[in-house]
Amino acid sequence: MQENLKNDKLKIGKYEFDSRFILGSGKYSLELIKSSIEEAKAQIITLALRRANTGEIANILDYIPKNITLLPNTSGARNADEALRIARLSRELGCGELIKIEVISDSRYLLPDNYETIKACELLAKEGFTPLPYMHADLYAARAMRDVGAAAIMPLAAPIGSNKGLCAKEFIQILLNEIDLPIIVDAGIGTPAQACEAMQMGVSAVMVNTAIAEAKDIALMARAFSLAVNAGRAAFLAGLASVSEAKASSPLTGFLRD
């Protein structure tokens, strides 16, 4: 079993990773980012371009170890064209071609616009990006994103920043059943137990930001999430026992007559 875990890679397009825990960076102080990455044992960290201004002295890129893969996002984009402009800027800053597409035109609930996200996926894929669309868990939209070049699908578990957990669990399960791409649960995961539950379902990875950034001990919470993600993945690979009615684990009769 240890060998199975050792060879169990997260594959996104042409990229491979040992860790299945993706760390958000949107709410951290710069000083805590490095220690959080180390405790999380993460190999991917998301990056909002607004925090990577190369003219600032305290540039977030200076706090991220060089061996960590950056996953810049298009946070702030309200439509596909704006997402494309942000992605191009990301590439100019040297952040690579992996890009998390975030297109949100709703300022109240902060729900992703699946229609514009599909368009953004197509535009970015044509320009050589490896797009990972953040989306509301909908099978038809996920199929469309896959067909235009998405390398993975990132459905929300619950509204962003809510810490409500797997509210969209049944819809995520449909994506797992029908979409032959990595499914990465993003947004709404509030506890390590919820991250573990998502991994037990068979999702490829989990991304967490708010639940760690708002913890009293950020580094320790990052470690807790890392352990939970690993435990959930191991449980999925091991094969969970089926849910049934009461079933004795030891003989209930006969032993007194032996």
From Swiss-Prot:
GO terms for cellular component: cytoplasm. It is found in: Cytoplasm. Pfam families: ThiG. 1-deoxy-D-xylulose 5-phosphate binds at residues 161, 187-188, 209-210. The active site is at 100 (schiff-base intermediate with dxp). GO terms for biological process: thiamine diphosphate biosynthetic process. Its EC number is 2.8.1.10. InterPro entries: Aldolase_TIM, Thiazole_synthase_ThiG, ThiG. It is an enzyme of class 2 (transferase). It catalyses: [ThiS sulfur-carrier protein]-C-terminal-Gly-aminoethanethioate + 2-iminoacetate + 1-deoxy-D-xylulose 5-phosphate = [ThiS sulfur-carrier protein]-C-terminal Gly-Gly + 2-[(2R,5Z)-2-carboxy-4-methylthiazol-5(2H)-ylidene]ethyl phosphate + 2 H2O + H(+). GO terms for molecular function: thiazole synthase activity. Its main location: cytoplasm. Pathway: Cofactor biosynthesis; thiamine diphosphate biosynthesis. It comes from the Bacteria. Keywords: Cytoplasm, Schiff base, Thiamine biosynthesis, Transferase. Catalyzes the rearrangement of 1-deoxy-D-xylulose 5-phosphate (DXP) to produce the thiazole phosphate moiety of thiamine. Sulfur is provided by the thiocarboxylate moiety of the carrier protein ThiS. In vitro, sulfur can be provided by H(2)S. Homotetramer. Forms heterodimers with either ThiH or ThiS. HAMAP family: ThiG. Belongs to the ThiG family. This is Thiazole synthase. It comes from Campylobacter jejuni subsp. doylei (strain ATCC BAA-1458 / RM4099 / 269.97). The lineage of its organism: Bacteria, Pseudomonadati, Campylobacterota, Epsilonproteobacteria, Campylobacterales.
